């Protein structure tokens, strides 16, 4: 909602750029934490976690000084009851749920997938699995923010959804572990547009949704992010 409230001409690009830093931040955390654990030993993980905790604290202090423009000042705010009665809103919720499930299912299992498929250590699995997934996801979002693509966000979402399905099939059915790992990376690239794309679509199609709409969308994404990996774990554990 902060990006959608910014008085900027190309909010789709800004949304993708903002989400790309989440991906690059994940890569940085994995690399720096791995290096720190190598140097200082595994018993230093509490100190490392405490140091990383300073980042959200700094963000909180920073945003406490940032003036935030309200979207509803222009369009007016829609009542929550009316929002919940809109079929379009429920379609956006399902898209957000699917985006979270597709993204986090592969992200959470990429490390274990690399370990078991390639027979490497957990450290190498994190670097090959999580870092490659997050890096390609960040690249997709960064390219979306910088390249002047005339294709609509709706067409991009459909194309990325098809690529995501193909990457999951490649990861599951590839005859060689290296090809399966490539599927993990392609999945990261394909899901890069989905999460920020749903936010942009919601702000464009329902500008009067207000903060409540984005809160519900975030909730749907979080449920998908937690439910997707859990379901995969249950299915994998039963076979």
Where are each of the predicted segments found?
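Interfacial helix-cap and linker-helix signal at transmembrane-aqueous boundaries
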Residues: 32-41, 114-115, 147-148, 203, ...
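Juxtamembrane intracellular "pre-TM" segments in multi-pass secondary transporters
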Residues: 68-92
């Amino acid at each position: 909602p902060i990006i959608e409230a910014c008085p900027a001409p190309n909010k789709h690009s800004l949304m993708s750029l903002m989400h790309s830093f989440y991906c690059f931040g994940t890569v940085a955390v994995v690399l720096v934490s791995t290096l720190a654990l190598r140097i200082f030993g595994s018993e230093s993980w509490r100190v490392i976690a405490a140091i990383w905790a300073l980042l959200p604290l700094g963000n909180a202090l920073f945003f406490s000084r940032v003036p935030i423009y309200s979207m509803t000042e222009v369009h007016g705010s829609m009542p929550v009851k009316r929002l919940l009665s809109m079929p379009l809103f429920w379609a956006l919720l399902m898209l957000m749920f699917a985006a979270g499930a597709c993204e986090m299912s592969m992200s959470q299992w990429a490390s274990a997938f690399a370990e078991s498929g390639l027979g490497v250590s957990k450290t190498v699995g994190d670097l090959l699995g999580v870092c490659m997934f997050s890096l390609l996801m960040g690249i997709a979002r960064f390219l979306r923010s910088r390249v002047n693509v005339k294709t609509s966000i709706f067409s991009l979402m459909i194309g990325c959804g098809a690529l995501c399905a193909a990457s999951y099939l490649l990861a599951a059915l590839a005859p060689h572990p290296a090809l399966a790992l490539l599927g993990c990376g392609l999945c990261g690239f394909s899901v890069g547009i989905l999460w920020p794309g749903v936010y942009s679509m919601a702000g464009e199609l329902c500008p009067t949704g207000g903060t409540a709409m984005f809160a519900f969308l975030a909730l749907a994404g979080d449920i998908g992010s937690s439910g997707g990996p859990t379901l995969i774990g249950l299915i994998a554990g039963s076979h």
